[in-house]
Amino acid sequence: MAKRDYYEVLGVARGASADEIKKAYRAKAKQLHPDRNKDCKVSEAAFKEVNEAYECLKDDQKKAAYDRFGHAAFENGGGGFGRGNGHGDFGSAFADVFEDLFGDMMGRRAGGGGRSRASRGQDLRYNLRVSLEEAYNGAQKTINVPGSVACAACNGTGAEGAVEPATCPTCSGMGKVRATQGFFTVERTCPTCSGHGQIVKNPCQECRGAGRVQKERTLSVNIPAGVETGTRIRLAGEGDAGMRGGPAGDLYIFIEVREHPIFMRDGRMLACQVPVSMTTAALGGEIEVPTIDGGRSRVKVPPGTQSGKQLRLRGKGMPPLRHGPGLNGEAGDMLIELAVETPVNLTARQKELLREFEAINADNNPQTQGFFQKIKGFWDEMKG
């Protein structure tokens, strides 16, 4: 069976550079590696063919001989090309594949001269903590966001000077190449331009051809009234800069509202616990309570108030988030839970008055009387 052209095997043009040949080989070897295609004889044969082609084309002397004489240059001992078991330098080949596999994950290929067509930047996330007062009133916050910005040296093109990106010679600008494996023809991403269809032959030295550089930016963010923990604010175009002039991603700000020393929040509802004196609880009266807007409101305490009683202030809770469909409406309420305070550090006279009060207080503690009646009934049943 006639051997296939080595350039065809690797999917590169005859005028391909050493870097282009190496990139094409890595992509092919990664795709056809035996670890990825176990028990597949077609892939195994194709993998050997790729290694054989690369062993020839990566060597300048062997490549020159092949370009002149084709496969005949290495027949009958010509040229001294030893194929061995068909794998060539397998250790080197595997190292190239390993580097390619994990190099992509670690971002070590960002400085290469291959990719060039514009692509959108990544979206970014920023967690922002605000106070409850800021969530109530709304606020303007200044934040520092690390990320990438368009390279000033090349205006985001990735090319040095006025050099324009060139059409990829491997895929002719299509971004895809076709490879034949046995009876199958497979279309895959072009290994030279990584699917972008263009290459930068003279990459910018500042950004190494990426069209963007790392830089921390200072942004002003408008926090609308009514936000709560989990609220997401989108700043369009404030994410990472795009590759080589592509559009920037978006910045998503996730709000976290800090706990408040006085108020507890549940949606639009606010709640707080307010102490009330024993006499005010017994006789009734008025007390002042703080509100989230920084003011104070007077509320009436009914006579005979017990600890845990709740009073409601209409419209004194959190405002609605005034952004988005279905989010408008009225402000929430504020619940006030009263805690009757037992007096401490009593004087002798105060103690005497309380004892006198207790002596004539038999019919004024219905809950206490009811409780002990239940206890008495319980013990009577046990004895019976």
Swiss-Prot record:
Zinc-finger as UniProt keyword: yes
Compartments where found: Cytoplasm
Domain of life per record: Bacteria
Alphabetical list of CDD domains matching this protein: DnaJ, DnaJ_C, DnaJ_zf
Chain positions of CXXCXGXG motif repeats: 151-158, 168-175, 190-197, 204-211
GO biological process terms, semicolon-separated: chaperone cofactor-dependent protein refolding; DNA replication; protein refolding; response to heat
A Pfam cross-reference name: DnaJ_CXXCXGXG
Record comment regarding domains: The J domain is necessary and sufficient to stimulate DnaK ATPase activity. Zinc center 1 plays an important role in the autonomous, DnaK-independent chaperone activity of DnaJ. Zinc center 2 is essential for interaction with DnaK and for DnaJ activity.
PANTHER family documented for this protein: CHAPERONE PROTEIN DNAJ (PTHR43096:SF48), DNAJ HOMOLOG 1, MITOCHONDRIAL-RELATED (PTHR43096)
Free-text function comment from the UniProt entry: Participates actively in the response to hyperosmotic and heat shock by preventing the aggregation of stress-denatured proteins and by disaggregating proteins, also in an autonomous, DnaK-independent fashion. Unfolded proteins bind initially to DnaJ; upon interaction with the DnaJ-bound protein, DnaK hydrolyzes its bound ATP, resulting in the formation of a stable complex. GrpE releases ADP from DnaK; ATP binding to DnaK triggers the release of the substrate protein, thus completing the reaction cycle.
Protein's name according to its UniProt entry: Chaperone protein DnaJ
Taxonomic source organism: Paracoccus denitrificans (strain Pd 1222)
